[in-house]
Amino acid sequence: MEKFKSLSKDAVDVTEGRILEKWKNEDILNKCIENRENAPYFVFYDGPATANGHPGLHHMVAKFLKDTICKYKTMQGYKVLRKVGWDTHGLPVELQVEKELGFSGKKDIEKYGIKEFNQKCRESVWKNESTFTDLTEKMGQFIDIKHPYVTYDNNYIE
């Protein structure tokens, strides 16, 4: 005796698409915020991922746990402001760009040009942004992905 109807991948994809479209069309995230006009605030900054690499399972598990906290606080009546961030600098980024360019150290960077190298690093951190964004939406994380904080942005640094 089958307790649950088995669904094909196509059926799951169609259902997922309908739900995501409904959430988007009805602007569910903003409704969760606007419906709590005088409620106490709970502000959540999603610890930044570096989008120069592919998202891993650890990213998705962390996003799920963070989203669970935000949704729980929403159910408790808080006005939950959520903002995603991007880690756009640091040694891992520089090492990856050095590897891509075939460099073996500081002298190669100086020969290439520090300004040019920094620009290459800035470009590299956005390689997989769309993959991260797509996965964030598909997993149903309610978070502001349109206005992220970016760690190389002067507004963030100040």
Language-model-derived ranges and their functions:
Residues 1-158:
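N-terminal, positively charged nucleic-acid-binding surface of large information/translation enzymes
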